[in-house]
């Protein structure tokens, strides 16, 4: 809830450099039954700057969707940044990437990713996967409130 008692929208940060995947992910979250705000950052350096600024302001995202293959700073480096910053470490991070390589999967779970999902090639299947992430993280699980995660409780 927000300070005025109203339910605040769920804030999702999508870190993705492929415009087609951004469009499909946006479409899937727009059809969500839960009010959400989807912010998009398209390179790793901007993602770290954005996350740092949000943490400084005490308004961290409720969920991060992270591609591994990004320009400037890689997805695994961003994941490590998130999980080692006490203000961000409780934010769930779902890796959503084209790689199905075992070493990528192990490397991201070693860095404490909350889930690893290989992007389907089929558009309808991709939309379905994003909707399942939406359903699970926005309606099934309880997420720490943005302020609690940033405060490091």
Model segments located where?
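Non-catalytic signal-transmission and effector/linker regions of two-component phosphorelay proteins
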Residues: 1-13, 19-39, 45-48, 52, ...
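Hydrophobic residue at a beta-alpha junction
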Residues: 42, 70-73, 82
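Conserved phosphotransfer cores of two-component systems
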Residues: 54-59, 83-90, 111
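Active-site residues of response regulator receiver
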Residues: 66-67, 97
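Negatively charged, flexible loop motifs adjacent to catalytic sites
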Residues: 71, 87, 99-103
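Short, glycine/charged-rich "phosphate-handling" switch motifs in NTP-dependent
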Residues: 114
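A Lys-centered signature of the CheY-like receiver
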Residues: 119
